[in-house]
Each structure stands twice: as C-alpha cells, then as structure tokens.
Design a protein with these regions (language model features):
Chain B
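Thiotemplate assembly-line natural product biosynthesis machinery
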Residues: 1-23, 76-80
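Catalytic nucleophile serine of serine hydrolases
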Residues: 40
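Short active-site alpha-helical segment characteristic of glycosyltransferases
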Residues: 46
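Phosphopantetheine carrier-protein modules
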Residues: 17-37, 54-61, 65
C-alpha cells in the first residue's frame, strides 16, 4: 500500500520547517528509524526519521521549500497495513500541525537509531550559524571537511574556505556575544518559545513547590568518583539530577506524561528532556530516551552527546518530540531557585538552582553544607500539591544518595 | 610548542566545542563563561579535548585554571611539549 510521510510536529512550538536535504531517492528501501530528511527549523537542523519500513516512491517536497507541519514530504510503498509501531504520542501543536494529519513521531529503539546514524554520517554536519555564514560567503558546505565535534563544520571552517576577510579585532570585541546567524536563529526560536509558553500560561493551572536539600554527600561522592576515573568518564552533577527525576517518575504517576483533549495519559517510558541553553539566545529541551533504565555512565554520555548536538544544530525529530517531563537547571547562572513553566502537552517540569555552601542546621547546630534548591511546576488538572511535594521530596532523597542512582 | 602556536591550537579546540562561536571574536583575557556562556558541560568537553590532543589530564579541582584563553596558555605551556 502507499503511505504518506509527513513533516512531524516537534513539540508544541514548531509549526513549519524548511527541507534542506534528502538522504534518500525514489526507489530506495528505508527502514523504520532511518534519518531520511534534514529539516531546518527554529531549533536548528533536525534529522527526521521515517516511522515505517518501505520503499520510497516519490519525493514530494524539494530542498529549499518551507512547509507547515503535517505536509506530505514523500510517499512510500509499504508492506501490509502498518502494524502499530512503538510510537511516542504525537505532540499536539498549536499551528496547522494539530489534528489527525500529523505523522506519528518515532521513538527509536537502540538498534534502529544506529541505522539512522549511518545514514546521516555520509553528509556534512554543520551548525546553523556556520550554515548561515556559508550562505553569506557563498561557500559550498559539501566541499568542506569539518573540524568540530563529530566532524561538524564550524564557522572557522567556513571562513577559511570563504573569500571574505575576517572581521577586524576592534569590531570583534564589540560583538563578542554575537555570532553569524545566531541572531536569525534566536529570533525564530524566540517566537517559538513565546508561543509555547503563552499557551502554557493560558491553559495550564500551574502550582509551584520548592525544596532545599543538603547534597554534601553527593557532591563529595561525585568529586571522589571523578578523581578516580579518566576524564572521559567524569560525571556532571546534572547527570545525578536527571537520573533522580527519572526514577522518581517511576515511583509517582502524574508527572511524566501528556495532557491532551481534556485527558491525562502517563508516558509508558520516562523520557527526561533536558533544557539546553543555546548561545546567542533561546533554548531547546531534547530528551534522553528511556532515562530511568540507563546506568549513570550511559546516561552521562547520552547527555553529553545531546548537548553537543543541540548546540551544533543536529537533533533528531524523535528527541524533540519525546520528552515526558523536563529538567531545567539554572545552577550555572548562580540563581538560588527556578520557577519554571510547563511545556505543553507535558504536565510537569523540575527546576534546579545552583549547588553551593549555605548555612544548614545539622543536629541542632548551624554548619556550612552543600545545598541545592529543587523546584517543581506541575499541572493542577492532573496532580495536587500534596502528591507534588512527595514527588519532589523523592527526587531530593535520590540525589542525596547517588550511589543508588 | 610556541606560545602563539599553543594559543591558536587551544582556540580551535574551544571553537570546536562551541561551533557557534566566531574565533575572531574571542578575547584572550576574558573568561569563556563571561564571553559566551561556557558552562560545565563545555568545560568537561574542553578537558576531554585537552586529553585527546595533548595527553594532559586536568583534574576537576583545577578547572578554574582553564577559564580563559590566557589562563589556559599559562597553565598548559609547561605541560605541553
């Protein structure tokens, strides 16, 4: 039978994308989970995976074309009526993507994810900023060898290949925070964030809780562990937080899932999204898939790769659509606590402030201890403050005992 | 390795980790964090790159000595041959 491959919605705040490159041509066999097309969005270039096996019959949308979410990108010949694959619940969009026309988004199994990896290895990886600079300088990115992470093409690579002289030192000093294209991408991303957050504040009755907790033991455990392993195996404190949130979502229902059409549905697996700040403005929150099942070293490596790809503009559609809850850590910004906004259709978001020495009462005496303020914003349509308090306390307990994470 | 050579190499490592940073805009005396929001993940990636490139293992306790390009050059010049 003939099947339509549509541009999936990538979370609540994306309603269009520009097809940049097809990795397949008519006649090619494709397997579920394979990255078949690269789409440029406000969140950077996104690798979009196909959600069923088949043979490509027709490419409908040519590279360079901007289309709304839900548009048929290609048609493929498939075997029997597709048996229900493991799908992430299709995110509800605010734009034209809303409704039955939206393709389901795939949650890849580790095996198929590898197939996509191979498919995407053949073409250049490039950050959005570098892509814009390449366009400005008329540089063909296909001809460049990248020097960035995973062979990614950096601005420097583009400039070396381009004819234009570099900006002068004086000019450079003024614009230290501005890189080429960052403004353009940040503008689109700002609009997307504005749409999603406005919708959240309009529709979701948030309640907020915060809890400060002594994490001295965890900080010491982490320092001792990191001193005894090679640099490549060091953990960040955030990895402990991510795992603690994931395990607590297994313990308590009502925080890891989706609220759609007046109904809450718990996500079968916990996919913790991690808020990643993009230099030049904006943020994305891609998911670490099946977070609760991952041992800390695996989780850390996935987290590291995810942040790197988020900043290089190399995320996958499934990673953007999957988060069932988000963790946002503003510890780097040295604030005490975060009071975050839920990203619909999710129903909860956990915040973390900076870890640092604070006066703390231990056995009736005030002592300097390493303390972190954890916070929770949750959807009152799904849970109440009492359950939220238990959930937050469980996260705090789990972070405080990292050897059990 | 000459000081200039080391500085150039370090700069390319930094912009490799942060591909959205234009190397021409990096000011050697100002902390990476203050210039382009270099965070703990970037610092970890930088330490990993230093290990790959030079075989130097920078302990976590000494991360503050990698805070700016000038500090990196001062810290690494006698460690890198």
């Amino acid at each position: 039978m003939l099947s339509e491959f549509r541009l999936p919605a990538l979370g609540a705040d994306m309603d269009e994308g520009t097809v940049v490159q097809w990795n397949v041509a008519p006649g090619d066999a494709v397997t579920r989970g394979q990255v078949v097309v690269v789409v440029e969005t406000d969140k950077g270039a996104i690798d979009v995976e196909i959600f069923e096996d088949g043979v490509v019959r027709e490419i409908v949308v040519a590279p360079g074309t901007k289309v709304p979410v839900g548009t048929v990108l290609a048609r493929l010949e498939t075997q029997a009526p597709s048996t229900a694959p493991t799908l992430a619940p299709a995110p509800v969009g605010t734009g034209p993507g809303e409704g039955p026309g939206v393709s389901p988004v795939l949650v890849p199994e580790s095996g198929v994810e590898r197939a996509g990896e191979r498919a995407s290895a053949a073409r250049p990886r490039i950050s959005p900023a570098a892509r814009v600079r390449a366009r400005e300088l008329g540089v063909d990115v296909g001809s460049l060898a990248g020097s960035g992470p995973g062979g990614a093409i950096t601005i420097e690579d583009v400039q070396k290949a381009g004819p234009a002289p570099r900006p002068s030192r004086d000019k450079a000093g003024e614009g230290a925070r501005e890189s080429a294209g960052a403004g353009e991408r940040a503008g689109g991303m700002r609009e997307a964030i504005a749409a999603a957050m406005s919708r959240s504040k309009r529709e979701i009755p948030h309640y907020y809780l915060s809890l400060s907790t002594d994490v001295t033991a965890a900080v010491e455990w982490l320092a001792a562990r990191n001193a005894s392993v090679p640099v490549t195996e060091r953990l960040l404190f955030a990895a402990l937080l991510i795992k603690a949130v994931a395990l607590s979502c297994v313990d308590f229902k009502g925080f890891s899932g989706f609220y759609r059409e007046g109904r809450y549905e718990e996500s079968p697996l916990v996919h913790v999204g991690v808020a990643v700040a993009i230099r030049g403005g904006g943020l994305v929150a891609p998911a670490i898939m099946d977070t609760a099942q991952k041992p800390l070293p695996v989780l850390m490596e996935d987290f590291r790769q995810l942040v790197t790809r988020a900043r290089a503009g190399r995320l996958r559609a499934s990673e953007l659509a999957a988060p069932s809850i988000i963790l946002t850590s503003l510890g780097e910004a040295a604030v005490d606590a975060v009071f975050p906004i839920i990203q619909p259709p999710q129903v909860a978001i956990v915040g973390a402030g900076a870890v640092g020495p604070r006066p703390w009462v231990v056995d009736g005496r005030v002592e300097p201890r390493q303390v972190i303020a954890l916070s929770l914003a949750a959807d009152h349509r799904v849970t109440d403050g009492r359950l939220g308090a238990q959930f937050l306390a469980r996260i705090a307990e789990r972070v405080a005992a990292p050897d059990r994470l | 390795m000459k000081r200039e050579e080391l500085a150039a190499k370090l700069l390319s490592l930094v912009t490799g980790i942060a591909p959205d940073v234009d190397p021409a805009t990096v000011i050697p005396g100002i902390n990476f964090r203050d210039q382009f929001d270099f965070d703990s993940m970037d610092t970890l990636n930088f330490a990993i790159e230093l290990h790959r490139e030079f075989g130097v293992e920078v302990p976590e306790a000494e991360y503050s000595r990698l805070a700016s390009l000038d500090k990196c050059v001062a810290y690494l010049s006698d460690k890198v041959r």
